[in-house]
């Protein structure tokens, strides 16, 4: 996936994966893993990378990643 996506496209991608289980407005760690493996495969170099990335993105510590938290990752990789 190209990092150059419109905000609407990014929101659609986020919602597609977030709706798989639990809260449709939040990504669980498994949903984030699936999204990254599919859309940004070069970001995941191993299991520790996912854990570190999830911890970094989950700013409020609720165990899930909101769209706002996800946007931090998108901004970081599009620079």
Swiss-Prot record:
Pfam families linked: EF-hand_1, S_100
Keyword Repeat (UniProt): yes
GO-annotated molecular function: calcium ion binding; calcium-dependent protein binding; vitamin D binding
Coiled-coil residue windows: none
Residues reported in the UniProt entry to bind Ca(2+) 1: 26, 31
EF-hand domain mapped to chain residues: 13-48, 45-79
Any one GO cellular component localisation term in the record: apical plasma membrane
Binding site for Ca(2+) 2: 58, 60, 62, 64, 69
UniProt keywords, alphabetically: Acetylation, Calcium, Metal-binding, Phosphoprotein, Repeat, Vitamin D
Disulfide bridge map: none
Residues where Phosphoserine is found: 42
Residue positions, PTM N-acetylserine: 2
Source superkingdom: Eukaryota
Keyword Repeat: yes
PANTHER family: PROTEIN S100-G, S100 CALCIUM-BINDING PROTEIN
Protein name (database record): Protein S100-G
Source organism (scientific name): Bos taurus (Bovine)
Lineage of the species this protein comes from: Eukaryota, Metazoa, Chordata, Craniata, Vertebrata
Gene from which the chain derives: S100G
């Amino acid at each position: 996936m190209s990092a150059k996506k419109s905000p609407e496209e990014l929101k659609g991608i986020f919602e597609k994966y977030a709706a798989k289980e639990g809260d449709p407005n939040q990504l669980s760690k498994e949903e984030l893993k699936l999204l990254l493996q599919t859309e940004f495969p070069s970001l995941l170099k191993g299991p520790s990378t996912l854990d570190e990335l999830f911890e970094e993105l989950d700013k409020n510590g609720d165990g899930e990643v909101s769209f706002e938290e996800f946007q931090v990752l998108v901004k970081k990789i599009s620079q």
